[in-house]
Amino acid sequence: LAKKNIELNNLQKIIDIDLAGCSNKSGYLTVDNKKSGGGASLTSSIKGTEIPLFNLENILKQNNLDSAILKMDCEGCEYDSILKTDNEIMRKFSTIIIEYHYGYQNLVEKLESCGFQVEKTSPMYYSHYHIGYIYATKN
């Protein structure tokens, strides 16, 4: 669906889609195909599909980016991905939008320590967990 949307809007030269997971480290993860859908998180499984994992530094390097906008909706991986990424790498993003699931305080502190001005929404109860949004921009 995402690829079709990119084609319909003539964005092929702007947006690239990698079928992968985001993590604090690069590697591979086997995902159980039966545990998918809205709100599914990436946890390692014995059976399923092996997918590559990329960290934020790898994503910037592989796409030859010195600056980027980051939008994360990764069902819980935002904590390791953001909190364990070096501040120098985080500063390469001009804008960061994050859907959070288990609280925002640590994420906000990390982003502010990287020089971002941060706004957040109050958590909303959705299905069986709370979610909210963080909007971080450079001054």
What are these regions (language model features)?
Residues 1-139:
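Phosphate/nucleotide-binding beta-alpha loop and adjacent structural elements of enzyme active sites
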